[in-house]
Amino acid sequence: DDILNNKTDGTLNDNFYRALKKRVYIFTWEHFYPSKDYSLFVPTDALQKRVDAFTKDFAPRCVGVHIRRTDNAVSMGKSTTEQFIAEMEQELLAHPETRFFLATDDQREEDLLRSRFPGKIISNQSRTIDRNSVAGMHDALLDLYCLAASDKIIGSYWSSFTDTAADMRGI
């Protein structure tokens, strides 16, 4: 209710932002309201260092790949592994120097892509998959910022995570 009471012209009032506590956790699969403003998304210094450690290897070209497998049946049905592989192969045909940042919740998918595209996959191999843990949330943010730093995103159908990364990048 607080959000609805403080919303005018499709955006939240400045007073509402100022009244927020220092840290806010938002859990949703939908946009709150039509907005492409991600200026409030500011990574902590620790997260930014982790993002920088991965993105330094993105040059000269990096395509983000988001493969969601464990909890989104719609995504799994529409975004097959074969489709991801075909898209990645097309990228390499057009741009052989391309590397891929892989964000996935399925280790088998990562293992398959690493064997299919040796030396081309960048990912957080020490990630925590449990999205309900603090470490898992931190790793998800790392993936989100790295996807948003890529030149292009090949993402999962019906995934707000893919959509948010693309919006953050302006893709």
Task: List each model region and its residues.
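Secretory-pathway luminal glycosyltransferase catalytic domains
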Residues: 1-94
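Catalytic donor nucleotide-activated moiety binding site of glycosyltransferases and closely related
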Residues: 66-70, 89-134
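A short acidic (Asp/Glu
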Residues: 75-77, 110-115, 164-167
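Aromatic-acidic/polar surface patches that form glycan- and anion
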Residues: 77, 102, 136-139, 154
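Donor nucleotide-activated moiety binding/catalytic core segment of transferases
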Residues: 82, 119-150
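Non-transmembrane alpha-helical segments in soluble domains
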Residues: 85-92, 114, 150, 166
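A donor-sugar binding/catalytic signature common to diverse glycosyltransferases
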Residues: 140-171
